[in-house]
Amino acid sequence: MAAGKEIRGKIKSVENTKKITKAMEMVAASKMRKAQERMLAARPYSEKIRNIAVHLGQANPEYVHPFMQVNGDAKTAGVIVVTTDKGLCGGMNTNVLRAVTAKLRELQDQGVSAEAVAIGNKGLGFLNRVGAKVVSHATGLGDTPHLEKLIGPVKVLLDAYAAGKLSAVYLSYTKFINTMKQESVVEQLLPLSSESMQAEKTSGHSWDYIYEPDAQSVIDELLVRYAESLVYQAVAENMASEQSARMVAMKAATDNAGNVISELKLVYNKTRQAAITTELSEIVAGAAAV
């Protein structure tokens, strides 16, 4: 029964793997709820500050911030790539990196080079493998992202855009839709999107502001907060998507392990039955010979 012993060993191995994937599924479910709470808490702030920034872009303030201006002469664009630090989350990272690759090719076709900021180990490794120019990165964010860890690397691109060195800054991440669905997106962070401005105009809301103490100090602070909040929201969305994708992936792995165990047990029983039948046949044949 050497074959039976080998099958029993495989069954034991798959059962141990099933215990691990089940535990990871439960941990991911717990982290997912916390990540969703953080994401949903931050979403109203990021949406409101985006609306205010768009209002400023379509108004006629006495001071125009560099983030509102189009750097037409620049031949370099910035791309912020948000991925996970760890794997085992299905095709989530693959999908967002595929979207980033499409954007890089689009920029290349336009004669525009790219400088990247990687947030997450998976994106950093990918960008290094494809030979992209990575000017800064942030990894090891843990389960709770902190803005102070994010803004340093991102500020490299923001300062470059303000200095007129970049034509645009794009933000790529995985947007959380629901537990079973996440969407890879590449959004324009800078300059303020003309599509967003047009949407605000068609919605019928268009106004200017009175600035105190002066327009420059208010707008400078506000648009920096705008960029920071959108990057933080992207990371929060990405983390919620990560835990959801990992929970689903681990559940699928647990279910598959159960199916493999059932199939192995069936093979084991058939092998054992065949061995017993062979032994009985030999005994009967021996008795008949006597």
Curated annotation (Swiss-Prot):
Q: Where in the cell is it found?
A: Cell inner membrane
A biological process from GO? proton motive force-driven plasma membrane ATP synthesis
> Where is the major localization of this protein?
membrane
Q: Any idea what this protein is called?
A: ATP synthase gamma chain
Q: How does it assemble?
A: F-type ATPases have 2 components, CF(1) - the catalytic core - and CF(0) - the membrane proton channel. CF(1) has five subunits: alpha(3), beta(3), gamma(1), delta(1), epsilon(1). CF(0) has three main subunits: a, b and c.
Q: How does it sit in the membrane?
A: Peripheral membrane protein
Give yes or no: UniProt keyword Ion transport.
yes
Its annotated function is as follows:
Produces ATP from ADP in the presence of a proton gradient across the membrane. The gamma chain is believed to be important in regulating ATPase activity and the flow of protons through the CF(0) complex.
Query: Which GO molecular function annotations are given, in alphabetical order?
Result: ATP binding; proton-transporting ATP synthase activity, rotational mechanism
A GO-annotated cellular component = proton-transporting ATP synthase complex
What is the species listed in this Swiss-Prot or TrEMBL entry? Answer: Delftia acidovorans (strain DSM 14801 / SPH-1)
Sorted keywords for this record are: ATP synthesis, Cell inner membrane, Cell membrane, CF(1), Hydrogen ion transport, Ion transport, Membrane, Transport
UniProt family annotation: Belongs to the ATPase gamma chain family.
